[in-house]
Amino acid sequence: MTRPIDRRSGAGWRSAARRATRLARLGLTAALALIVTPVIALASAPPAPALGNGLALTPPMGWNDWNAYGCNVSEQLVEQTAQAMHNNGMQAAGYQYVNIDDCWMASSRDGSGNLVANSGKFPDGIAAVANYVHSLGLKLGIYEDTGTATCAGYPGSYGHEQQDARLFASWGVDYLKEDWCNIPFGDFSGQSHQQVAQTLYTRMRDALSSTGRPIAFSMCNGWDSSVQPWNWAGPVANLWRTTVDIQPNFTSMLNNFHVNVGLADHAGPGAWNDPDMLEIGNGMTATENQAEFSLWAEMAAPLIEGGNLVNPGSSTLSVLTNKAVIAVDQDSLGKQGTQVSSASGHDVLAKPLANGDVSVVLFNETGSTATISTTASAIGKSGSSGYTLTDLWTGATSTTSGTISASVPAHGAVMYRVAGGTTGGGPASEIHAVGAGKCLDVPNATRTNGTQLQIFDCAGGTGQIWASSGGRLTVYNGAKCLDAYDNQTTAGTKVEIWDCNGGANQQWQVNSNGTITGVQSGLCLDVTGAGTANGTPVELWPCNEGSNQRWTVG
């Protein structure tokens, strides 16, 4: 068995040393970008369409060796971990990927230009490891880099994308994590880091697709904040890093939470924000472990554990295999939870679920126990005199007429599943027109009945903030409803605002394919003529799967 190494002398070097290497290899501009935590609007832009490879329709779940072992990866470690996951309840709980990180390969390619596994670490080769992992019903992941060398200095995929993809497929690899070190920016004169990233990651996407093997694709470049993958990576990868490398302490976990929580608009089935691996059991307290797992699940983040699973300890396993919390992360609606409120280090997050329930996390960032509260209406619930709260960590149930509150320990989280009443699309938010990259907008924020809606640059104004409740889409805190003009049900009917009156022409269905249909007419909310200019009107039109009929809510 591979002995877990001391993080201070072994794997402990990984984030500090890897970041230092990245800084040196990316240059001063990227170094400055890494130091600053980005400030991101809660609804900054519509998500890019998902990759569409049929993979990761819920956030990937698995294990990666790097956080606990660094470069001390081996065939024995990977196979022992796979066997442990098979035996200890993790596989049954939904974990499926066993992922090898950096340092698995030899220091150079062979005479044919192929990557070669380090024979001392992987004497039987990667294909044999894949066969073993597959025999347990699990899947194997591997690591590479978009640059000329990996972050630890091993051969990168730059210029070898097609060759490496074919090799990975021939080995039976199911998941590729591709890093962002040693990028030859000189080959891309005049291009930004983001433009280079788009080019290189798209190359590997296409190479993987051409193999015919389903390989989930994970981009690891969010730590270079100038790349901002959440704005463009939906059609390129199944998940993308949004943050710097996580460390096994509360401060690091909190930083990654702060960066990732504001990116909910960019996540969805097949395309996920990744705030980095879980550090459960790697040094945080039991309370902090529970908080991290709650937050990652609420944010629909990949659940990739980075600890020692051969000897994990019962408390670590109890967190990692909490099926009620995992069910929130894996919910088929595919919504990332959003921040309802955040004041004085007391956070409330809400995540709508496919069956109409809402998951709520009350998170205490501070060093003292605090009472944190919200309401059913604030999390998108309505239409009931009572709601049932299920504590997802204790299993206890309670009822409330509307107030949701708990005493939350320092650095801790309380997580509820709220049932009852009707559920809208969660907290009020912008509605994005996917094809145009603009927002559903009431012109000049007027409140005049009969005003036709348009699309306009997203600015977070009152005429762009919509809430969903009881099948209605409302603006101005419920004062006006989205309305089909004069109860008409024909193509070209204008969509307007009107006083909410319970009419059938004010009932709307937000569909999983991104369309919004009028319940009365069966027609789709449509940007006229597939226009993209500010002021283009919105109408009803027969549904045709056009991008001008796709919207993202919340």
Predicted regions and their residues:
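Secretory targeting and sorting signals
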Residues: 2-50
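Structural recognition of the beta-strand scaffold that forms the well-ordered cores
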Residues: 57-65, 94-101, 139-144, 174-179, ...
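Aromatic-lined carbohydrate-binding/catalytic grooves of carbohydrate-active enzymes
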Residues: 81, 85-189
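Aromatic-lined carbohydrate-recognition surfaces of secreted/lumenal glycan-active proteins
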Residues: 138-155, 205-226
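Glycan-recognition surfaces
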Residues: 163, 213-308
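Carbohydrate-binding surface patches
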Residues: 296-299, 304-306, 342-381
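C-terminal beta-strand-rich structural cap/linker in extracellular carbohydrate-active enzymes
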Residues: 400-424
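Extracellular glycan-recognition/adhesion modules and their associated mucin-like linkers
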Residues: 422-447, 462-489, 506-532, 550-554
